[in-house]
């Protein structure tokens, strides 16, 4: 196997114009998005949102090439925010995947030209099944648009690509339309963070929204009595490996906590440590939350109170 040589970043220089080109492209696509928001047909969007909201089956996306990639993302966003959805490849549809479609499903077909052959071939079958069709296209007079129940136009003069060939602006606009529809449905369905977490249990957000204090709290936290000496406190914090120790009163209730930070602050202001007791060093009334408190609520409370430790209380006190 021949050795591969990685390119040297210093072996060639980039024409400064290319950085200008990057800025120009971002500005142009941003301007096209602004233009779309101004020219959108509110009647068509109202019809589309009603179709999605009243769909009894799945919202199915389909598109070829780059439009297909965008369709997959749109479908994933809808599905993860409360609108059942999946993507079907138009070419695969003619080799058995049409069986995935039921009369209760709503189809969103994506084609910038509105004349993509593989997409148009789907239309007769979909009409025969009785499915409603939404077209996302840049050509309101196209064959696809004429056969759709609702049409969302891109209102795009040309692609940002200097050759007006590579799908660039069209995919950006289509992606934005997908996001806009999904967000409208989130608001219509009153889709809340807890609902979002049900579909994202493996992500960090899902963990924060589904996990309770009891699920992550440390048990067997070291404890000392109110009259414990400075040396005893140090020993218990060190052996506990949790950076803190709880201080218990005579009845075994929580009187306070002592953290590494509490020790440092106490040592800075006290000259004599040999006679110091836990009662003098501890933080009284530490942040205490019921064990069934959601982690996201606990984190917000800890940030607000500027503390690194929270005590989980079975009694909810």
UniProtKB/Swiss-Prot annotation:
GO terms for molecular function: arabinose-5-phosphate isomerase activity; ATP binding; metal ion binding. Involved in the biosynthesis of K-antigen capsules. Catalyzes the reversible aldol-ketol isomerization between D-ribulose 5-phosphate (Ru5P) and D-arabinose 5-phosphate (A5P). Gene3D superfamilies: CBS-domain, Glucose-6-phosphate isomerase like protein, domain 1. The gene is kpsF. It comes from Escherichia coli. This is Arabinose 5-phosphate isomerase KpsF. InterPro entries: CBS_dom, CBS_dom_sf, GutQ/KpsF_isomerases, KdsD/KpsF-type, SIS_dom, SIS_dom_sf, SIS_Kpsf. Keywords: ATP-binding, CBS domain, Isomerase, Lipopolysaccharide biosynthesis, Metal-binding, Nucleotide-binding, Repeat, Zinc. One of its GO terms (biological process) is lipopolysaccharide biosynthetic process.
């Amino acid at each position: 196997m021949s050795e591969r040589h990685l390119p040297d970043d210093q072996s060639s220089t980039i024409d400064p114009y290319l950085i200008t080109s990057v800025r120009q492209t971002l500005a142009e696509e941003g301007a096209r998005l602004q233009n779309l928001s101004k020219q959108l047909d509110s009647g068509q969007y109202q019809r589309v949102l009603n179709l999605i909201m009243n769909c009894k089956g799945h919202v199915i996306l389909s598109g070829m090439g780059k439009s297909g990639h965008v369709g997959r993302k749109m479908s994933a966003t809808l599905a993860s925010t409360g609108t059942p959805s999946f993507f079907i490849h138009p070419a695969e549809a003619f080799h058995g995947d049409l069986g995935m479609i039921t009369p209760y499903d709503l189809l969103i077909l994506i084609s910038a030209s509105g004349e993509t052959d593989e997409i148009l071939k789907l239309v007769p079958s979909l009409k025969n099944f009785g499915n409603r069709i939404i077209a996302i296209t840049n050509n309101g007079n196209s064959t696809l648009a004429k056969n759709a129940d609702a049409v969302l136009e891109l209102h795009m003069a040309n692609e940002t690509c200097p050759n007006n060939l590579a799908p660039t602006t069209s995919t950006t606009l289509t992606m934005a339309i997908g996001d806009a529809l999904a967000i409208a449905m989130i608001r219509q369905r009153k889709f809340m963070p807890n609902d979002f977490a049900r579909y994202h249990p493996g992500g960090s957000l899902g963990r924060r929204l589904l996990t309770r204090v009891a699920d992550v709290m440390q048990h067997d936290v070291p404890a000392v009595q109110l009259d414990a000496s400075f040396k005893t406190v140090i020993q218990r914090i060190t052996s506990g490996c949790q950076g803190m120790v709880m201080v218990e009163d005579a009845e075994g209730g929580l009187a306070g906590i002592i953290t590494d930070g509490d020790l440092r602050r106490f040592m800075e202001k006290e000259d004599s440590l040999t006679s110091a007791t836990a009662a003098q060093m501890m933080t009284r009334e530490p942040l205490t939350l019921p064990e069934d408190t959601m982690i996201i609520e606990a984190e917000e409370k800890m940030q607000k109170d500027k503390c690194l430790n929270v005590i989980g209380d079975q009694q909810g006190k």
